Amino acid sequence: MTIKEVKELLSTDVTEDQLAELEKDPRVGVQKLIISYRKKQAKLLAKKQAFLERFSYEKQFWQKGELVAGVDEVGRGPLAGPVVTAAVIIDHNFDLLEVNDSKKLSPEKRLQLYPKILSEAVSVGIGVKSAAVIDQINIYEADRQAMAQAVKALDVKPNALLVDAMNVPVDLPQIELIKGDAKSNSIAAASIVAKVFRDKLMDDYDKIYPQYGFPRNAGYGTKEHIDALKKYGPTPIHRKTFAPVSDFFK
């Protein structure tokens, strides 16, 4: 077997017996391929184990035959745009290993996972509260109301919620988890859905207000965004109660 053929074999599902045979091959090139293969397999196994561990909270409900929704938000800190929340119900068939805290994923990876989550989830709900609402009732309360909106948008009612460090104003049992998107696959899936949904909204706003660089900053106070604010002033989607936007209304 040539080294090229060994490489092709190792790109498939090989058995331990096949590996044992290959390990007898004295060629340096073959041994390097085997070491690389075993490293990749160890990495994949660790990823699978971490993924399964992030079902620990969900399993508490699944074992009772209950559904639980993960809830998360994105857009608390920006100077412009809405706060967006998502509620996602998954079950034991959910197998998207790459689902994790959205902040740990590249924009490309989030975009790849978004339709897959929508397809595999039992139900997905979205909540959106505008900059005007945020200014009216404050970001914390707008966040809570958007989370409630997302839960109510689910077409299947959950028995309980797993929430990333918040309390949602709905009549359901809740477990609040600090850094929940790193501890629960349901919350992680919700964080990805909310992030991609909000990024798309900000891309749409960029077509109306192209000066502020929303596709690059998502409404956060980057230098580009602040410079545009100084030059052009705030738009209707800017949060009037957030500094330095608030300086324009004094």
Swiss-Prot record:
Organism superkingdom: Bacteria
Gene Ontology BP annotations: DNA replication, removal of RNA primer; mismatch repair
EC number per UniProt: 3.1.26.4
Catalysed reaction, written as an equation: Endonucleolytic cleavage to 5'-phosphomonoester
Keywords associated with the record: Cytoplasm, Endonuclease, Hydrolase, Manganese, Metal-binding, Nuclease
UniProt cross-references to InterPro entries, sorted A to Z: RNase_HII, RNase_HII/HIII, RNase_HII/HIII_dom, RNaseH-like_sf, RNaseH_sf
Subcellular location: Cytoplasm
Binding-site positions, a divalent metal cation: D72, E73, D164
GO molecular function: manganese ion binding; RNA binding; RNA-DNA hybrid ribonuclease activity
UniProt-listed Pfam families: RNase_HII (PF01351)
GO cellular component, one term: cytoplasm
Primary location group: cytoplasm
Keyword Cytoplasm listed: yes
Protein family: Belongs to the RNase HII family.
Its job: Endonuclease that specifically degrades the RNA of RNA-DNA hybrids.
Name assigned to this protein: Ribonuclease HII
